[in-house]
From Swiss-Prot:
Trans-enoyl reductase; part of the gene cluster that mediates the biosynthesis of HIV-1 integrase inhibitor equisetin and of fusarisetin A, both trans-fused decalin-containing tetramic acids showing also antimicrobial activity. The PKS module of fsa1 together with the enoylreductase fsa3 catalyze the formation of the polyketide unit which is then conjugated to L-serine by the condensation domain of the fsa1 NRPS module. Activity of the Dieckmann cyclase domain (RED) results in release of the Dieckmann product intermediate. This is Trans-enoyl reductase fsa3. The keyword Hydrolase does not apply. GO terms for molecular function: nucleotide binding; oxidoreductase activity, acting on NAD(P)H. Belongs to the zinc-containing alcohol dehydrogenase family. Substrate binds at I131, S132, F133, M134, T135, T136, G137, L138, G275, P276, Q277, M278, L279. Pfam families: ADH_N, ADH_zinc_N. Pathway: Mycotoxin biosynthesis. It comes from Fusarium sp. (strain FN080326). SUPFAM superfamilies: GroES-like (SSF50129), NAD(P)-binding Rossmann-fold domains (SSF51735).
Length: 353
């Protein structure tokens, strides 16, 4: 039996996060699984869990890796067993499920969203996979609706723009776009050109070059129909809208997009997504991040996680570069501040527990 209480990072009454050693360990029922956390990663979303997004007492954190400690009675479909090394992304700071979050000694997840960590990857590398590959999968194959997928590639090698290719979501997107049979066209600073090429980018452009959009249009014969914006600012949206070909297309961001920019091209369909939508449950965060329960999203989540399992099993995807720190949950608080201050560049910040 596991202990009754645990240490975790939880929301405070004044909209912050603190370390607590008297938190409840998640109760395991149905198809849920209890995991002893071994490593966690800090993501930009963690920096946004402040103020009205904080539920007092709710556990924070999204990305984790660990060892299966207990399996619910109905968790029988995905061959998850006690002792398995697993990772995934869950929804931390969840007012509807406050005992579950990544930044804790123990966490829980439904069995279908768990990924088994292959032998060639460490817990620290596993902890970096969840948000990056789940969010980009949702963006590319649900929101943008790319024909084909990494297990059944498209027959036409269309160009797909990945803006911000050297980010963690960018390198994940480049790999998935290429595996799905498309040509990943990406942007980053020149110092990261070789990095994004190593992940499969077919062409790379310096977003600071004044001729960048013209060069992309020339390279793609003005035929980009799909754009994933991994940076998701007004400026990056304007860039993507200008780079999309004359026939229009689809644009997906990872944050709410500018309605003013959206109005500049009626032939481009904009959207923005959040990774937790794949759970299919209500996201009870303040507007504009509130979402109703959506069974169709949940079905996509089951489908996409199964795709990711096969990609991992066959060593077809690899994680973003990571920087590993020790010090446990107490140091995660410092890590959140470092991400907020943009002190970490080009790598995912991971902590061992």
């Amino acid at each position: 039996m596991v202990q009754r209480q645990q240490t975790a990072l939880v929301g405070t009454d004044d909209g912050g996060i603190r370390l607590s050693s008297t938190e409840t360990i998640p109760n395991i029922t149905g198809d849920s699984v209890l995991i002893k956390t071994k490593a966690v990663s800090v993501n930009p979303v963690d920096t946004k869990m402040i103020g009205p997004y904080v539920t007092p007492g709710a556990v924070a954190g999204f990305d984790f890796a660990g060892v299966v400690e207990m399996v619910g009675p109905d968790a029988t479909k995905c061959d998850i067993r006690v002792g398995d090394r697993v990772c995934t992304a869950i929804m931390g700071m969840n007012p509807l499920d406050p005992t579950v979050g990544a930044f804790a000694e123990y966490t829980a997840a439904v069995e279908w969203i768990l990924l088994k960590i292959p032998p060639n990857l460490s817990f620290e590398e596993g902890a970096s996979l969840g948000i990056s590959f789940m969010t980009t999968g949702l963006a590319l194959f649900k929101s943008l609706g790319l024909p084909g997928n990494p297990l059944s590639p498209a027959t036409e090698k269309l160009p797909v723009l990945v803006y911000g290719g050297s980010s963690a979501t960018g390198t994940a997107a480049i790999q998935l776009v290429k595996l799905a049979g498309f040509a990943p066209i990406t942007t980053c600073s020149p110092r990261n050109f070789e990095l994004v090429k190593s992940y499969g980018a077919s062409a790379v452009f310096d977003y600071n070059d004044p001729d960048c959009i013209r060069d992309i249009k020339k390279h793609t014969k003005n035929n980009i129909r799909y754009a994933l914006d991994c940076i998701s600012t007004t400026q990056s949206m304007q860039f993507c809208y200008q780079a999309i070909g004359r026939a229009g297309g689809k644009y997906t961001a990872l944050e709410p997009f500018s309605e003013a920019v959206a109005r500049t091209r009626k032939m481009v369909k904009p959207d923005w997504i959040m990774g937790p939508q794949m759970l299919g449950k209500e996201i009870r965060w303040p507007e504009p991040h509130w979402r109703p329960a959506n069974a169709e999203m949940g079905e996509f989540g089951v489908y996409w996680t199964a795709v990711l399992r096969k990609l991992l099993d066959n060593n077809l995807i690899r994680p973003h570069a990571i920087v590993v720190r020790e010090g446990g949950l107490e140091k995660v608080l410092d890590g959140i501040e470092d991400i907020r201050a943009k002190k970490i560049s080009g790598k995912k910040l991971v902590f061992t527990l």
